[in-house]
Design a protein with these regions (language model features):
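C-terminal active-site "lid" helix and adjoining low-complexity regulatory extension at the edge
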Residues: 279-318, 325-413
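Active-site nucleotide/adenylate-binding loops and adjacent lid/helix of ATP-dependent enzymes
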Residues: 104-233
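A long amphipathic alpha-helix within ATP-dependent nucleotide-binding catalytic cores
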Residues: 216-329
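Beta-strand scaffold of nucleotide-dependent catalytic cores
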Residues: 171, 182-185, 192-198, 250-268, ...
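Short, solvent-exposed loop/turn segments at secondary-structure junctions
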Residues: 24-25, 175-178, 241-242, 261, ...
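A solvent-exposed, charged loop/short amphipathic helix patch at secondary-structure junctions
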Residues: 83-93, 194-208, 277-288
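Extreme N-terminal starter segment of soluble prokaryotic enzymes
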Residues: 13-18
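Conserved N-proximal alpha/beta basic substrate-recognition cap immediately N-terminal to
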Residues: 22-34, 38-159
Length: 413
């Protein structure tokens, strides 16, 4: 196909894409490469900096508009949360307010997402409530939904732990991602407490995102971290003991495109935090499927659960579902649903998914072409779907910044 995208085999004019993102980021490069590989004109790139400074952007009615992560750009981070140091944790509530306002300021075009759904996806409390209302299994939470009591600090966390008999729980920033501001908290019968987190507590009380997972065992340190995070909003979840592979705790990131589970990555870790940029490792998808079958389950049911979670956001083309397998591999729960959870370079689609041989971006383009009647794309979920092999190659992309500190990234695995 010519670079102009004019193809006599097409039923009409080639679709034109625009992507809102950070032009220097490899997310944009990978998406643009996938668009060109489909024989389409290169997408128009609209920088987040321009959107935030202009309080919006305009798109022609026939331009297909994709939003990508605003993370990993210090100037965008400053505009979203007034952060002079991108490695600081604080300011996620301000980030959320400005980001959701910016998404509502995008005018025209054919959106591949929905501002209302994005507002839910980036609020863990609302997302949890949405999933629970749809009977999608999730870890129990006392902060689920808009009517939940606010958590004003560590004293409230301690009170909720006692009231709901939660000796182990996860404390999360309501608007955080990439494990920023997440604490895995454990208490013992004798009153001792510890927290595992990537948060670095500086002597003056400032909080920094770190690439090093730390363990705090002094309650005053844990209280200081939680008290500093609380003004941005907190979400609490009962700790679901996860299954393991080869002695390492395990979970999965499943990408769902146009209603179909298309890509899967297994994440394993020696700590409660499995994020790959925090020392987690890729796991063996075949071993996961074998474990599910050995427990009497069906892999197709596992994928169907992720599709049910994605169906809660019908106007968002693609989401990344974090799936938590319970010990024994018989039960699963959805930990989170990520709007920008598709950065999985060189990973091709699951056999039988309709995305075989396609990366996550190419699968989305195929789905758009199908919707516009200009390509085969992805069909409806196949009830006989029996994946048997997927070479999950994940290139951990986070670079060390300021030695072992890292800025916000938003919804990477």
């Amino acid at each position: 196909m010519s670079p102009s995208g004019n193809d006599p085999g097409r039923a009409g004019p080639a679709p034109r894409f625009a992507v809102v993102g950070n032009p220097e980021n490899r997310r944009i490069t990978l998406f643009a490469d996938a668009v060109r590989a489909a024989g389409l004109p290169a997408p128009r790139v609209v920088p987040w900096v321009a959107v935030l400074r202009s309080d919006g952007a305009d798109f022609p009615a026939d331009e297909i508009v994709r939003l990508d992560s605003p993370g990993e750009n210090p100037e965008v981070d400053r505009l979203l949360r007034d952060a002079q140091d991108p490695t600081r944790v604080e300011g996620s509530a301000r980030w959320y307010a400005r980001f959701t306002r910016a998404t509502r300021g995008l005018r025209g075009g054919v959106r591949l997402d929905d501002p209302d759904e994005l507002a839910v996806l980036f609020d863990k409390r609302r997302c949890h409530a949405t999933l629970a209302a749809a009977d999608v299994p999730v870890p129990w939470s006392p902060t689920s939904g808009a009517a939940a009591e606010p958590v004003r600090g560590w004293d409230d966390v301690r009170a909720l732990m006692r009231r709901h008999r939660m000796p182990r729980l996860f404390v999360k920033l309501a608007h955080g991602s990439s494990a920023s501001g997440v604490l895995a908290v454990e208490s013992s019968a004798d009153g001792r407490i510890r927290a595992t987190t990537s948060v670095e507590l500086a002597p003056e009380g400032a909080l920094f995102n770190s690439l090093k997972v730390r363990r705090y065992e002094r309650e005053r340190d844990i209280a200081a971290i939680v008290d500093a995070l609380a003004p941005d909003g907190l979400h609490l979840e009962r700790w679901l003991p996860k299954a393991s592979l080869r002695g390492r705790v395990t979970d999965l990131r499943i990408v769902v495109v146009a209603g179909r589970a298309t890509h899967a990555v297994v994440r394993t870790s020696s700590s409660p935090l499995t994020n790959l940029h925090l020392g987690g490792s890729r796991g063996d998808l075949d071993a996961v499927r074998d474990a599910v079958r050995a427990a009497g389950g069906r892999w197709t049911d596992v994928l169907a659960l992720c599709e049910r979670a994605a169906a809660c956001f019908p106007h968002t083309l693609c989401v990344g579902v974090d799936l938590l397998p319970a010990i024994g591999w018989r039960r699963f729960a959805v930990g989170e649903v990520n709007a920008f959870g598709d950065l999985l370079p060189r990973l091709t689609g699951l056999p039988g998914s309709g995305a075989e041989g396609l990366g996550t971006y190419a699968a989305q383009i195929a789905a758009v072409l199908r919707r516009t009647g200009l390509g085969g794309g992805l069909g409806p979920p196949n009830p006989s779907y029996r994946p048997h092999d997927a070479h999950d190659v994940y290139d951990a992309h986070h670079q060390h910044q300021q030695q072992h500190r890292t800025g916000t990234t938003h919804a990477s695995a």
